């Protein structure tokens, strides 16, 4: 009976592909309607004025304007809004 495992049988070598999440457009930037602002898992950022929430929690601009990030409410939630120009 062999006392050493045969070579070439590593059980490592798998990893998931990066999902490219995060903020795509920053505060003060001008965006067009339909632009993706944040890609996220869950609602780290909440949708404010003129911002829509996709089925995968992606935030996108519903109107053309400047992005405004703000913290408000009793739970100090982060909101993303679009100020129309």
Swiss-Prot record:
UniProt keyword list: Ribonucleoprotein, Ribosomal protein
GO biological process terms, semicolon-separated: translation
Top-level taxon of origin: Bacteria
Pfam families on file: Ribosomal_L27 (PF01016)
Gene Ontology, cellular component aspect: cytosolic large ribosomal subunit
Molecular function as annotated in GO: structural constituent of ribosome
Region (Disordered): 1-20
Record's keyword annotation contains Ribonucleoprotein: yes
Protein family: Belongs to the bacterial ribosomal protein bL27 family.
HAMAP family assigned: Ribosomal_bL27
Database matches in NCBIfam families: L27 (TIGR00062)
Name of the protein described by the UniProt record: Large ribosomal subunit protein bL27
Organism whose genome encodes this protein: Aeromonas salmonicida (strain A449)
């Amino acid at each position: 009976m062999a006392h050493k495992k045969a070579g070439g049988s590593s059980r490592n070598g798998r990893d998931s592909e990066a999902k490219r999440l995060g903020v795509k457009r920053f505060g003060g930037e001008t965006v067009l309607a339909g632009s993706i602002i944040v890609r996220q898992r869950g609602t780290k950022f909440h949708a404010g004025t003129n911002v829509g929430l996709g089925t995968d929690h992606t935030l996108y601009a519903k109107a053309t304007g400047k992005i405004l990030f703000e913290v408000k409410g009793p739970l100090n939630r982060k909101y993303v809004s679009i100020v129309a120009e």
